[in-house]
């Protein structure tokens, strides 16, 4: 499978051009990561007639330009995903879906609501603005946080390898060490970048959604789990489906590539009919 490298505006993205593709999918990676970590899934998925794109979020991977890694906001992330999604739609003429992995599900949902280019969203994460996991109000919307941010600004950093146990998140011992060997991963977020997820209001909250959403979760996901997934799915209006992958871990694209690809493929083609 051929992997192309694209730069659109300031967004770096990989493209896996599937032969005779009948739809496209734009992937949003999770916390600390970049678009290239899903090579195996993307190549396999593209081989089944999908035009697959996997972008680096702003402040991640190679979408850093004149900024340090970890400096971004969810507003920027959503804008970049929408711009690239519209570019994909215009240049390919294909229906476009957006897929969010873990933290990337927040950006994916918000992008889905910010543009009509996306036919639907596959969300493999649940810390989504307007969901029960990201309530309003919350401490990041407080006057106290604004005072702290005004005082310290970009000097306050969140250590991601302390915040997340990647061995548990990825489902195997050694995952954290392996991630640290990849120079494109990001190990610190500016606290204001992380806070932006809790301060953001999507164009349409989950409770008023009208677009197709496919929630997916591993049966043994230690980060969210089926109960959390059901809680968020139940709080979402509109055409929503929830899929629990048997014996699945958190990173379904990485640890259950073939079987999970089949599930995503079937749902997307059903929506595109």
Predicted feature descriptions by range:
Residues 222-228:
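Conserved alpha/beta-hydrolase "acid-adjacent" motif
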Residues 99-123, 128-129:
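Conserved hydrolase catalytic core segment
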């Amino acid at each position: 499978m051929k992997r192309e490298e694209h730069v659109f505006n300031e967004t770096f993205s990989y493209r896996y051009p599937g032969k005779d593709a009948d739809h496209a999918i734009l992937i949003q990676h999770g916390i600390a990561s970049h678009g290239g970590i899903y090579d195996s899934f993307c190549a396999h998925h593209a081989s089944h007639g999908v035009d697959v794109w996997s972008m680096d979020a702003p402040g991640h991977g190679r979408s850093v330009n004149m900024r340090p890694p970890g400096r971004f906001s969810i507003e920027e992330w959503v804008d970049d995903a929408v711009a690239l999604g519209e570019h994909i739609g215009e240049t390919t003429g294909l229906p476009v879906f957006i897929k969010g992995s873990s933290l990337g599900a927040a950006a994916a949902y918000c992008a889905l609501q910010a543009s009509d280019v996306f036919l639907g969203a596959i969300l493999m994460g649940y810390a989504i603005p307007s969901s029960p996991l990201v309530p309003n109000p919350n401490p990041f919307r407080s006057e106290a946080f604004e005072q702290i941010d005004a005082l310290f600004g970009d000097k306050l950093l969140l250590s991601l390898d302390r915040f997340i146990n990647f061995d548990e998140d990825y489902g195997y011992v050694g995952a954290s060490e392996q991630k640290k060997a990849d120079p494109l991963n990001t190990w610190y977020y500016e606290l204001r970048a992380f806070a932006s997820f809790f301060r953001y209001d999507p164009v349409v909250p989950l409770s008023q959604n009208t677009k197709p959403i496919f929630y997916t979760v591993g049966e043994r996901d230690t980060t969210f789990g089926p109960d959390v997934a059901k809680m968020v799915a139940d709080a979402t209006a509109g055409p929503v489906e929830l899929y629990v992958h048997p014996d699945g871990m958190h990173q379904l694209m990485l640890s259950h590539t073939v079987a999970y690809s089949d599930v995503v493929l079937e749902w997307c083609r059903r929506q595109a009919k």
